[in-house]
Amino acid sequence: MSDIYDGLTTEQQREEAYEGFIWKNLRRNYAGHYIHGMLGMTGFRLVNAPTFIPAYLHVLSGSDLVVSLGACLQQLGGVISPIFAAQQIESRKKILPVSMFLGTMMRVQILAIAIAGWLLGGTTLLVSVLFFLFLFGLFSGPQGVAFQFLLAKMIPISRRGRLQGWRNLSGGIVAAALSYFAGKYLVGGNVWGNGYSTTYLLAFVLTSAGLTIFSLLVREPEPPTVRKSTPMRDRLRELVPMLRNNPGFGYFMIARTFAIASRVAQPFYIIYVGKRIGFSGEVIGTLTLAFLMADTVMSIGWGYLADRYGFRSNFIIALVFWIGSTILLMAVSSPLWLFIAFFGLGAGNSGYMMSAQNIVFEFGHRDDMAMRLAFSNTAESLMSAIGPLVGGVIAATLGYHTVFWVAIVCEAIALVLLLVLVEEPRKARLRLEAEKARALSETSTTDLAQREDDGDNV
């Protein structure tokens, strides 16, 4: 164990030392996560926003099914890898080195997509982009587990919401402006012979800068306990009992699965708009600006709402945003209302991401945190991989409106499950802690009375 545990013999003393280390290093760890998120997420948003990649694949192929295949392959890469990552990191005292490796490999794929656009063409370019999207997802899965685990180790739960709120605010300002600039000038002007490649190169530079600064700033604590290393087969067998013993987490997983199933529609928002008002770099940039601006405007509200009421509230409101914005998208055709619809979709995505990435930590013990997060992310990646492919088939046969209504139904089911069956885990934990404290108090009172009786008898 670390020096902070020297001479400490009881579990309570080690827990107090661990908490002390976290608060002592909170300022620099807060800054590290803030800068990493601001720069890193700014670059990743250029890749993950439902505009640039779908539009690029459509330009290269002219096919809705290929757009679906790209989204499917990216998510498919993250289906199994999170669980393997969790099994590797949950028994380690420190995971920063492996996190840096995973983060670097994830960023390399963005650079590869950029270089392929300059050096290749035709079918070879299309296949290469699809391949690197798969690798991007493959490393994205374990990277997400590792960095969320680091966040949980370094930042107290009472500060995570506002950290991510301010981080998303800053990153949203940069990303929104950058997306408009990239769409209008880099893609629209075909800078360096391929505006999309230039955009992805810019994303690589930003994300790499964030990762480098993060590694120089943060101080990772060693937890007072770590889970004993378990073979993968045995660890997988424990997943079902984990769900059975924690029904709140189980119902949350079902609700999250339905919410993610609604991603059948996500790659087709920009394609649908392009078919209605035409494709151009300015249209792509403007709607990406709307989607990402929602992070800027809403992130602080999401963060403080989560710190005050818990992350379940974010999830519920995000689903309402998604449902309303999808209905609006189908009903309007003017640029202003389309901008508002994409803003609503981005606001919902912002709230959902903040909730889904953090609420998982609150459902059980710290030692199982990595596996809960990995299981949750794996389920999300699986549905995200299947969803767009199914959406592509539906779009090609029944049209875009049918895809959008399927998404709305899935989101409505998730909303009902959250409202009826999933209790805010923070509230449940505080209630259990209060009951435990009351039981200890009653035990202490009983012991004191017994000692007094014994003294009287003597």
Residue locations for each model-derived region?
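Structural signature of the two symmetry-related core transmembrane helices
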Residues: 97-113, 204, 313-328, 405-408
